[in-house]
Curated annotation (Swiss-Prot):
One Pfam family cited in the UniProt record for this chain: FlgI
UniProt keyword annotations, A-Z: Bacterial flagellum, Periplasm, Signal
One GO cellular component term: bacterial-type flagellum basal body, distal rod, P ring
UniProt protein name: Flagellar P-ring protein
Known role: Assembles around the rod to form the L-ring and probably protects the motor/basal body from shearing forces during rotation.
Similarity comment: family membership: Belongs to the FlgI family.
Subunit structure: The basal body constitutes a major portion of the flagellar organelle and consists of four rings (L,P,S, and M) mounted on a central rod.
PANTHER family found in the cross-reference section: FLAGELLAR P-RING PERIPLASMIC PROTEIN FLGI, FLAGELLAR P-RING PROTEIN
Length: 367
């Protein structure tokens, strides 16, 4: 059985090398379970030079008192702790799927109180938990801060970058492995980055052509299930072959994305316009405010005042029309719009009008 699999994989590699398609599976889909897992924890940073949380920050003082109690140091009732050299922080990290116990990873430190700077601080031992509440790593170490803040006695201050946050390179040690279906599942599921029925069908067909009929099955527009080898030792080679299979994805939907704030317009290459004529005029409205001094007569009882005299001009520029014949493509649209000297705002208006007229065969999305 193993010999048959090896021969099939060699044949698959040969076929992959002789075919030229648009995309590899690894570029348009991800293996279910192979992901980054977010970890978070609450901790204390000590060793700050008077830039920590201000005295009276209750959650910082309570956390500091609890930590001292756990270390066997009892705080007399009613005693308030000075927390100027201490800051309460949130610690975050990203744990990859295949990282193991004992390995280290970087962590980000962010102040949650009113600390001015974490420069020179040390994070005390902090557990990092996942979404399931389990502790997956422990973090501790000296913080690297890229920002700096300085203030004078008169209240003036200068801040460069963000001194209230920092990083600890290799500052967390992994204490537990993330459960991963790659090790125990009878099948492997690939999730498409952009769900599409045609792409899912073509992907499963490409896998079946190279790995054998019935190996892969598209279950919906976003997922393709592939039968996995029972032996774990064969799965790495198997996935290595799968993710390098190349095929031509389905054509995406015709879309036009408009950013109304910035005037950015993105048009996909398969946008088609039906026969239409476009005429777009520009109205230029200018309002000029001229200051006027009102000076009363010498013996009058009035007073000198400054007023504004407004002048409003409305000018309509000569508008030009252009015709979009049936089957017009992206290139023709851009050429026609540029020919009349349209601004980004004009382009948005023209595209919206074309869709309202039923001449635009695309989905118009305004963000």
């Amino acid at each position: 059985m193993r010999r048959i699999l090896v021969i099939r994989w060699i044949l698959a590699i040969h076929l992959i090398a002789t075919q030229v398609f648009a995309e590899r599976i690894k570029d348009i889909a991800t293996l279910a379970g192979v992901r980054v897992n977010q970890l978070v924890g609450y901790g204390l940073v000590v060793g700050l030079s008077g830039t920590g949380d201000k005295t009276g920050t209750k959650f910082t003082e309570d956390s500091f008192a609890n930590m001292l109690t756990q270390l066997g140091i009892n705080i007399p009732p009613g005693v308030r702790l000075n927390s100027k050299n201490i800051a309460a922080v949130m610690v975050t990290a990203n744990l990859s799927s295949f990282m193991k116990k004992g390995q280290t990873m970087d962590v980000n430190i962010s102040s949650i109180g009113d600390s001015k700077s974490l420069l020179g601080g040390t994070l005390l031992l902090t557990p990092l938990k996942g979404a399931d509440g389990r502790v997956y790593a422990m973090s501790q170490g000296n913080i690297v801060v890229s920002g700096i803040s300085a203030s004078g006695s008169d209240g003036s201050s200068v801040t460069v970058n963000v001194p209230s946050g920092g990083r600890i390179p290799n500052g967390a040690t992994i204490e537990a492995d993330i459960p991963n279906p790659f090790y125990y599942s009878n099948s492997l599921t690939y999730n498409l980055h952009t769900p599409d029925f045609t792409t899912a069908k073509r992907m499963s067909d490409a896998i079946n052509e190279l790995m054998g009929p019935g190996t892969a099955k598209a279950i919906d527009a976003g997922s393709v299930v592939v039968t996995a080898p029972k032996k774990l030792s064969q799965r790495v080679d198997y996935v290595s072959v799968l993710e390098n299979i190349e095929f031509k994805p389905g054509e995406p939907m015709a879309k036009i994305i408009i950013n109304a704030r910035t005037g950015t317009v993105v048009i996909s290459s398969n946008v088609i316009v039906k026969s239409a004529a476009v005429s777009h005029g520009n109205l230029v409205v200018s309002i000029t405010e001229t200051p006027v001094i009102s000076q009363p007569n010498a013996f009058a009882s009035g007073r000198t005042v400054a007023t504004q005299q407004s002048q409003v001009n409305i000018q309509q520029k000569n508008n030009r029309a252009f015709i979009l014949p049936k089957g017009t493509t992206l290139k023709d649209i851009v050429r026609g719009i540029n020919a009349v000297g349209a601004t980004p705002a004009d382009v948005i208006s023209i595209l919206e009008a074309l869709q309202q007229a039923g001449a635009l065969s695309a989905t118009l999305i305004v963000i």
